[in-house]
Structure formats: C-alpha cells, structure tokens
C-alpha cells in the first residue's frame, strides 16, 4: 500500500513538471507558486480519505471472501489456483463445480505470483485449466449438534446416507485450537464403562486416549458398539465414529449393526427422523483422495468437541489412526515436502499432536478417544505407531487366543494396561485386587506348558488351587453384551465398578472355590454367578 502511494506522488510530481517543459511559455512566478500551493492543498486534503479507507477494519475471514480465481494446474489431488486480487488465507475452503458436484479445495500453500496450492477433498477427475474457483472466506465447516446423531456424513459435512439434508442450524470449523490450560480439567477420573475386564485391569480416563489393538474377527466392532451403548446408558453421553481410510463395506456393516443393536435409530423406519440415536458417523473411505482421509478425523473431532462444550462426556472413535498418518504422508509428498524417516511427512509429530491435544477434558465436559491402531509389519518402532503411543493413556489389546476359548470380550488382561491403575487414583482396594488378578493369571500362563505336557496331576496342591481360581477368573472376565443379545440370546449386563471389585476380590480370596467354573461364564455381577452356580449344582445332583 505504501508503494502505491509513493508511486502516485511521483506521478503527480512528473505531471507538474511536464506541462512547463512542453509549453515552453514562461509563467508568472507568483501564479506558478499559487498553483503549486493549490496542488499541495489538494493532495493534503485527499490524503485523509485514502488513509481512512486503509484503516477501515476488515475481518480477516472476509478479506478475500467471494474472490474468484482460476485453475492453473491439476496434479492428482493437488490443484493450483491463481487469483487476481487478494489471496485466500491458508486453510481457507475454495469451491468449484466438478461434474455437477460441489468440490471443496483447502488452501495449503502460497506459491507466489498470486497462486495458491490446494488439496482437493474429492476426486479431481473432470477439472480443467481455466475453470473458475470461488474463495468462501472461511475454513471447512461441518454441522454439529444432536441433528448429526444417527447420520453419516463425509469430510465436508455432507450427508451420504440418502436420508436428506442434516437439519442442523449450527456449523463449526474443523480447525480448532486445543483448550487453554485454564480451561482443562486436572482431575484424574475414571470413565466407568460397565465392562468388567476394562474397568478392573485397564480403566479408561475421562478425556484420555485409548489404543485399541485387534485383528479381524476378535470382536473389535462389538466392543466399540458396547462402549457406545454403555456410555449412553450410564452417562447419557453421545459418541462420534470417524472412519479414517475405512473399507466401505466395514463402514456399511457398522452402520446397520448399530441400527440392529439399538445404538442408532433407522430413519427410514422412523419417518426420516434419527431421534433417539446415540452416535454420529463421519466417513472418509479408503478409495477417497488423501485430502479427505487426512481431514475426516478433524471433522469427527469437531462434532465431538461441540458435544463436550455442551457438558457431555463424549466417546470419540477413530478407525484407523494409522491411516490418518498415511494420508498425511501422501498429502505431504504431493505438496513437494522432503520426506523424513521411512517416507513419512516431516510434520508427523506436529500433525498428530494437533489432533491428539484437542482430545481432552475441560471443566465442562470430556472427550474420551478410542483409537484403533495398525502396526505396520508388527514393528512398534515404526514412526507412525510410535508417534501415536506417546499420546496414549491406556491400551486395550484383543487376543485371538482368548477369543478361541469363547471368552468375550476377548481382552487380554496381561497385555492391556492403563496409567489410571494407580492406588492414588483408583484407590488401594481396586489396585490390590487388580494386581492379585494379574498375578494369578500370570502364574497360570506360566504353568500351562507343564499342564499341556504332564497334566494337572503333576502340579502341587497350591498350584492346582491357583489354576482352578485362574480359570474361574478367566471366565468371570467374560460378559454378555447388550449389542450382542440378538446373537447370544442372553440379556446384556452393565456391571458397576463396586460389583466388579467385590466379585474378583472374592475369587482371589477363594470364597467361591466350591462353585463350578461354568457358573462364572457369561454373567454380570458375582451375585448372578452365585445363583447360576447353585442352579448348576442342583441340576447336577
């Protein structure tokens, strides 16, 4: 702006000099002085008008709103757009039309020559050079609030479930700052899930991050749905599921399983309404461009943050957090950044930190995140999972060997851990009982080779007693789920933390050594196990 003013002054000076040089007529000195004074007066009087216009406050988000640019280059998911006027801000959303559909581009870099480099949130097939692009003047925003529950949307908040538009009056930018220190809650509090094995041995923290490790067919989806169901019943909270790089088939299955289990309401059977649903779903499928997969976790988190700020305890699921990193690496390569270790983006830790630090408790509500984590080639030192581990408060490991025994949930009680399992947080009784359970199960695991080779008869009396208790504990860690009632025929059980501690404390102390093992399989509280045991003993006699 300063340069423009200077050049205009220079032009005016040259205009003053040029007429005298061209005419060759000598003017009266006094007249020329008066003329120059009048010119100076004109310039002085007009200067405030220019400065006033310059000092008029312009909102940052409206600085380039409505500016139209045109596409200069398309390379895969990267689109370069040139503007004549003001450039859009970094992270601004640009819009254009592609094959009759709305295409959103997010500004990633300013390249110079009035050109910005953007990342497309959908396919760029069909785009042409010279095509017009409009700056929205704002970042990508998604609908938030209860209207999103029971619905599936994409990264830019558009519904993809063929049930009509989302009836939300509120939207929110997907790029938010993490809560300030003064806003965050410093109280370490357990989020009781009603699932015995989780609450006893690897309790979740309100506002914590939990890594969920599990292969195919070990009950990961069922565990996720039960957590969603129990949080809604016990805490009245909502859940958000972000499918990052999800297989379309898996996402489709999850949606219908949630309807069948009662977690969500089928809008097609409820006059288009999803009232009563407990979970919002945001999908960026495996076949979508890296821009969508890199941003869909932020879209889901934004919805979760909205519920948290209304005072809710929210569950936020991400499947799979590795694919968030993978998409970030693709975007980074397309933008021309030099890769770091193993080909990942140089901003890996920054990108992960920006996401994870937003998942926290405030004095109003909490977001508890359960993140499925894929470990490439089972290498825990790979930068992607290693960066994720730094943020986790607990891990829940699902074991195939436990699932093969028919014990569900198939959570490994020895491989799962939580920083919340501390006597200062959970209390002395809870901590002591959990340690006793783990000690008995660890000793049982060590004895299994001897049992397999020599049989139970070769064990000492103490070891025989310990093995019997361990097998009962193992079975008591199983639990019927509400969301699996249709398959098991058994009503689901939500077990309080007090009942869980009471039951395992008695098992470790040998109070139930006289009951058969079958009495502890697929029951809720210890009182149910006692009733079942008496019934089994009566039938046997």
From Swiss-Prot:
ATP binds at residues 214-221. It is a peripheral membrane protein. SUPFAM superfamilies: C-terminal domain of alpha and beta subunits of F1 ATP synthase, N-terminal domain of alpha and beta subunits of F1 ATP synthase, P-loop containing nucleoside triphosphate hydrolases. SMART domains: AAA. Belongs to the ATPase alpha/beta chains family. Produces ATP from ADP in the presence of a proton gradient across the membrane. The catalytic sites are hosted primarily by the beta subunits. This is ATP synthase subunit beta. It comes from Bartonella tribocorum (strain CIP 105476 / IBS 506).
